[in-house]
């Protein structure tokens, strides 16, 4: 709960009074910490899910979550998005076509108290492990473009720079020029916000690639594939299930992406490393 002595710096961060011990000295100082609040998704007046999230770019979050979860297939399927903010949380009032709402409310969700969640609440293992339509993108990038995108992503994380407590996701074109960056306490949320921002800007996600400051979990790979992003690069490792999904969905999955180094786990044809297969790099 926000104390009277705290002041908001920006929606994604707040200032707290802390006791810092460093180099054998202790002092009372002002420190920036990441903001986090419950965000309720309400479709056609019916509550659907509550996510713990950073209270920035919530319109992008509403659209991106709806697309990556398969609630709607196209941005125009969301008729109205209204954001209502309160002292301790926010609600996203979303209107979708009646037939979509009827299908949605058959799905039972249990997302309370989570910082992002990609598969929570599905009613069967089969529903969780569904494979999106296979990606057919002709995208190809080189390792310089990937390194350029990673550098730009690092430079465009103001909340992380202030607090050290959030994830970031970005989308870059084939030359590695980062067009969009979003931050959130939840890695899934950050990617959802990018997906929503792409849709709102009417940018074809298949013409570029996503970079994230987290591991590449199954949920992250699923969201990228569902959004028709053909390549996902993470600075940390993927999971085995994420690799299996990427192989089946036609997604190029890259891990340990740092500077000009990386490991390609699936569909390597989209990344030109500049060396022959088997040649020492």
Swiss-Prot record:
The active site is at 117 (cysteine persulfide intermediate). It holds the Pfam family FdhD-NarQ. One of its GO terms (cellular component) is cytoplasm. One of its GO terms (biological process) is Mo-molybdopterin cofactor biosynthetic process. Transmembrane segments: none annotated. InterPro entries: Cytidine_deaminase-like (IPR016193), FdhD (IPR003786). It comes from the Bacteria. GO terms for molecular function: sulfur carrier activity; sulfurtransferase activity. Required for formate dehydrogenase (FDH) activity. Acts as a sulfur carrier protein that transfers sulfur from IscS to the molybdenum cofactor prior to its insertion into FDH. Belongs to the FdhD family. This is Sulfur carrier protein FdhD. The lineage of its organism: Bacteria, Pseudomonadati, Pseudomonadota, Gammaproteobacteria, Lysobacterales.
